[in-house]
Amino acid sequence: MRKLLTIFLVLLLAVMAADATRTTITAVAPTIGTAVNGANLWTATTSSGMLLTSIMQGNQLLIINTTVTSSSLWGINLTMKKGVGQYSVLGDKIYTLSRNQTYIIGPLSTSRFEQNNNTFLFDFNASRGKLIAVNLP
């Protein structure tokens, strides 16, 4: 039993260390009459993984703008990581996003993608774009 507990703790620490390398995105909730500098809200996509905080019962949208600075014909793949809810048995969700386009993805399902620590995890296969997360009212 003690050996199993030790193995579990080592695996837990490995998972926690993996999440520490993810870029954290905090969803914004723009309100009427509040000046917001839109340029400061966007976060560059990273291929090392991203983490969305400020979950509000699945009322978030991801707005993703894919950009290509080279002559590449490819866009990016977005993988929403399965969570721990009842629909997590459906697994990860992969979106293929063409280059130089803007996409709105969501509202994000907490019953499929929410993690134990109330976050969403997602990965991009390349760092070609920027995104913003928006909380809906």
Question: What function would you assign to each model-found segment?
Answer:
Residues 4-14:
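Sec-dependent N-terminal signal peptides
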Residues 19-53:
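Transition segment at domain starts
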Residues 47-58, 127, 137:
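Extracellular repetitive beta-rich solenoid segments
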Residues 53-76:
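Short, well-structured hydrophobic secondary-structure segments
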Residues 85-116:
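Intrinsically disordered, low-complexity Pro/Gly/Ser/Thr-rich segments with frequent PxxP/GP/PP motifs
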Residues 113-137:
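Terminal connector regions
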